[in-house]
């Protein structure tokens, strides 16, 4: 529980699900407004419709009452920071991570007094380059984020959130079902190879790669690979933009073949959930080609696209985003 609050808010939330019981109820006294940091105004915006779409979706699927228009602030020294419970930051939108001492002190106080900070794209594997995807095995905050928060809480490093953390089941539990895919009856569902990889490795139990910082024994900040790409909807309610899946696949003789394959690109190491390292091999242009895993197994990256895959990914990211924001309000 929060020991002290500089702002006051309350919300009434009931679980919107298929066959699940409402889990949490609180008094509803008005719309909750989520803040978003935009240091360069609209010039570096990524996924401009993402957060408003997610807030509208939370209003549709729960009894929560969110203002669908985020409150944009250009500086962490903005006095309005202390009037709202959650600050959202898309780290890919920041021109740099050079904050003034006044801004850092304001953010430190905000988190100490009960504020919650969500750093989207706060995890970014170095091999991705300009790729909008992510690695399911990235469990470290990006270096700029780590250096920034070391100034605020030098004794509180980011630590990975375990798969059983409540943030992954605050509102939704597990992976999306076919009812969220919006497919016609004659359209196929996810290919079995893709679904198996997603269920067992990419997003096990509907979880994700996240790290967080605790302040006064309360989770006050989380960082994740980019999620906003999965929140946007157009005026007709269709998901935008299209999302493809990158999965790892193996086949007979892969281990022997890839060890001797000709290769002219770069390699990067990525930290896995178990702390071991995957070695990623890239073709020119920073597109992952294959991976050498610490077990000695080699697998190739294969890319799948299509409406059923895109809808599934959007459903997952939207459910995850809802879990994060509702967790922030309830803890």
Predicted regions and their residues:
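Bacterial N-terminal signal peptides
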Residues: 4-15
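Aromatic-Pro/Gly-enriched surface loop or interdomain linker
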Residues: 20-86, 90-94, 228, 246-331
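Short, surface-exposed beta-strand/loop micro-motifs that present aromatic residues
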Residues: 21-25, 75-77, 204-221, 235-236, ...
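Extracellular/periplasmic catalytic domains that process cell-envelope and extracellular macromolecules
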Residues: 25-29, 79-83, 102-103, 110-112, ...
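Structural recognition of the beta-strand scaffold that forms the well-ordered cores
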Residues: 33-36, 85-90, 116-120, 157-161, ...
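Short, flexible/disordered intra-domain loops and linkers
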Residues: 45, 127-140
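Short alpha-beta junction capping motif
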Residues: 86-133
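Acidic, glycine-rich loop-and-strand cores that form catalytic or ligand-binding grooves
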Residues: 145-222, 227, 254-259
